[in-house]
From Swiss-Prot:
Protein name from the UniProt record: Small ribosomal subunit protein bS6
Region annotation (Disordered) ranges: 97-120
Keywords associated with the record: Ribonucleoprotein, Ribosomal protein, RNA-binding, rRNA-binding
Organism field: Rickettsia bellii (strain OSU 85-389)
Functional description taken from the UniProt entry: Binds together with bS18 to 16S ribosomal RNA.
Domain of life: Bacteria
Keyword RNA-binding assigned: yes
An example Gene Ontology biological process: translation
Residue ranges with Polar residues bias: 97-112
Taxonomic path: Bacteria, Pseudomonadati, Pseudomonadota, Alphaproteobacteria, Rickettsiales
Length: 120
């Protein structure tokens, strides 16, 4: 199995509960195929670097994955089909850090709730 980090952006009008459902669906896909989610981080509602369609903001979410390339491809296929996800990027990494990402470290914890940061 390989390690991947996947960041996806959800439309700004989607609620946090709906984002949780999206993440739960992705978690189910990975766990059903003997993979694991090593890290989850919600980075909050942030301005996009440029307008994507009619969207100027989006909810950013990071997933650290320990899975096979085939499962990663299935996860990306699901992201493409989900109309609430406006962009995503998945990269292969050597390892996944136990510490919060630099973006999460720089955020004010008062303004943005952290949904989950886990490490195995």
């Amino acid at each position: 199995m390989s390690f991947y980090e996947s960041v996806f952006i959800v439309r700004q009008d989607v609620s946090l509960n709906d984002i949780d459902k999206i993440v739960d669906d992705f978690t189910k896909i990975i766990k059903d195929n003997n993979g694991a989610i090593v890290k989850k981080e919600y980075w909050g509602l942030r301005a996009l670097a440029y307008k994507i369609g009619n969207h100027k903001k989006g909810h950013y979410y990071l997933l650290g994955l320990d899975t096979t390339p085939a499962v990663k491809q299935e996860l990306e296929r699901k992201m493409k089909l989900n109309e609430n996800i406006i962009r995503f990027l998945t990269q292969k990494v050597d390892s996944i850090s136990n510490e919060p990402s630099p973006i999460l470290k720089n955020q004010s914890t008062e303004n943005t709730p952290v949904i989950d940061v886990t490490a195995n």
